[in-house]
Curated annotation (Swiss-Prot):
Component of the cytochrome c oxidase (complex IV, CIV), a multisubunit enzyme composed of 14 subunits. The complex is composed of a catalytic core of 3 subunits MT-CO1, MT-CO2 and MT-CO3, encoded in the mitochondrial DNA, and 11 supernumerary subunits COX4I, COX5A, COX5B, COX6A, COX6B, COX6C, COX7A, COX7B, COX7C, COX8 and NDUFA4, which are encoded in the nuclear genome. GO terms for cellular component: mitochondrial inner membrane; respiratory chain complex IV. Component of the cytochrome c oxidase, the last enzyme in the mitochondrial electron transport chain which drives oxidative phosphorylation. The respiratory chain contains 3 multisubunit complexes succinate dehydrogenase (complex II, CII), ubiquinol-cytochrome c oxidoreductase (cytochrome b-c1 complex, complex III, CIII) and cytochrome c oxidase (complex IV, CIV), that cooperate to transfer electrons derived from NADH and succinate to molecular oxygen, creating an electrochemical gradient over the inner membrane that drives transmembrane transport and the ATP synthase. The keyword Zinc-finger does not apply. It is found in: Mitochondrion inner membrane. This is Cytochrome c oxidase subunit NDUFA4. Belongs to the complex IV NDUFA4 subunit family.
Amino acid sequence: MLRQILSQAKKHPSLIPLFVFIGTGASGATLYLLRLALFNPDVCWDRNNPEPWNKLGPNDQYKFYSVNVDYSKLKKERPDF
């Protein structure tokens, strides 16, 4: 399959940006799904810890992007579990 893509790119060089953008988008989507699967507290891979979000403190940032929130200055306002 890679050989066919390279032969098409040699015959039609205008397809090269299309292959680059599709490859970049696919790799970005894969990395984002990997990030969600490994670092999101809503996903639990360990059956011994069914509620991993209870271990998160108010200083832990698990959002992908937060605009104006400084997580280091937040107080703990919930009970320990």
